C-alpha cells in the first residue's frame, strides 16, 4: 500500500482498519511535490497541506483552496499530510473509526470484516461519509487530477474521482497513484469554503461548504457552484441552488432562498459527530453564510478572503 504523509493511514492501521503487509513510501518523490501557478494551478500530490495553505499564489488567486487546506486537522498534521492524501482520505463512520476491540464487540460492519451497514441495516451499500476538506473546493473550481499507473496515465475531473459507496469511494484503480491536481485559472471568480466541526482544530468535517460565483459588472451572478462535503459518501453538488442564483444578485433574500434549495441534497445519517437532524439544518445555514461572504457580508468567525478580479 502506498503512503505519503500517513496522517490518516497510520491511526487506521493502529485500529486494524487497514492491515497492509507492505507500505511503499512516496515522500522522496520530489517531482510530485511542487506547486506552480502559470495560468492554471498545478499541485503536486505530495505538496503538504501547509505548503498549499501558505503558498502566496494559491492564497492570492485560489483563496478557497488555501483556506480548505488550512482548516484540515492541526498544524503538526498539516505539516505532514499531503494535498493528494486529503483528496483520497478514507470515508468515516462512528461504527468504523473505533478500536478493533470495540468493533469486534458489536459484530463489525460491512466496511471492515462484517456484512451489514450498522447505520442503515437494510442498505446494500456502506454509508460512511466523505471526510475530505479540499475535494468540495476542487469540484467547485472544476479541478482535475492526474492518475498514473505502470502502463497508463489519465486525467479526470475531481468530481469523477468519487462514487456513491463508503467502501469503494474512489474511482481510482488499485494500481493508480494520484500525482497532480490541476485547477483552472479562476480570476474573476469569488470563492470560499466553510467547515463545521465540534472543535476549532483537529476534527474532520461534519459539514463542508464550498461556493464559487462569477459576477457580472452589475453584480448579477453569471455562474455559480455549490458543493457540500461531509453529508454523503462523496461530495454533493447543489446544482439546483447554483442554477437558481444565475441572473440574480447576492442579496439577503436571494441567499436565503438559494440556501433553502442547496441543503436538500444533503443526506447526513447518524454516523458522525453531533446529531444528523442538526447537521442537515446547519447545511442550510452554512450555505447562506458562504454565499453571504461572497456577497460581501461580514464573516466574524473567519478571516476575510480577498479575490483577484
Where are these predicted regions, by residue range?
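C-terminal structural segment of proteins
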Residues: 1-309
Amino acid at each position: 500500500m502506498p503512503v505519503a504523509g500517513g496522517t490518516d493511514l497510520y491511526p487506521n492501521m493502529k485500529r486494524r482498519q487497514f492491515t497492509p503487509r507492505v507500505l511503499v513510501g512516496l515522500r522522496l518523490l520530489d517531482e510530485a511535490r511542487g506547486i506552480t501557478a502559470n495560468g492554471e494551478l498545478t499541485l503536486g500530490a505530495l505538496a503538504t497541506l501547509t505548503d498549499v495553505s501558505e503558498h502566496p499564489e494559491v492564497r492570492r488567486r485560489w483563496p478557497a483552496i488555501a483556506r480548505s487546506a488550512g482548516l484540515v486537522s492541526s498544524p503538526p498534521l498539516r505539516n505532514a499530510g499531503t494535498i493528494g492524501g486529503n483528496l483520497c482520505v478514507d470515508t468515516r463512520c462512528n461504527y468504523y473509526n473505533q478500536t478493533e476491540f470495540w468493533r469486534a464487540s458489536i459484530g463489525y460492519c460491512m466496511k471492515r470484516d462484517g456484512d451489514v451497514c450498522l447505520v442503515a441495516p437494510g442498505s446494500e451499500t456502506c454509508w460512511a461519509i466523505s471526510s475530505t476538506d479540499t475535494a468540495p473546493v476542487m469540484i467547485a473550481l472544476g479541478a482535475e487530477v492526474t492518475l498514473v499507473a505502470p502502463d497508463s496515465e489519465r486525467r479526470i475531473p475531481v468530481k469523477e474521482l468519487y462514487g456513491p459507496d463508503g467502501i469503494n469511494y474512489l474511482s481510482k484503480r488499485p494500481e493508480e497513484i494520484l500525482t497532480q491536481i490541476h485547477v483552472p485559472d479562476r480570476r474573476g471568480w469569488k470563492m470560499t469554503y466553510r467547515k463545521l466541526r465540534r472543535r476549532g482544530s483537529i476534527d474532520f468535517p461534519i459539514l463542508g461548504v464550498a461556493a464559487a460565483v462569477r459576477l457580472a459588472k452589475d453584480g448579477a451572478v453569471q455562474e455559480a457552484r455549490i458543493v457540500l462535503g461531509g453529508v454523503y459518501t462523496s461530495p454533493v453538488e447543489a446544482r439546483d441552488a447554483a442554477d437558481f442564483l444565475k441572473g440574480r444578485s447576492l442579496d439577503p433574500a436571494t441567499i436565503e432562498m438559494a440556501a433553502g434549495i442547496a441543503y436538500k441534497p444533503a443526506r447526513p445519517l447518524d454516523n458522525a459527530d453531533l446529531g444528523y437532524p442538526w447537521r442537515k439544518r446547519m447545511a442550510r445555514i452554512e450555505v447562506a453564510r458562504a454565499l453571504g461572504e461572497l456577497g460581501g457580508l461580514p464573516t466574524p468567525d473567519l478571516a476575510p478572503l480577498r479575490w483577484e478580479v
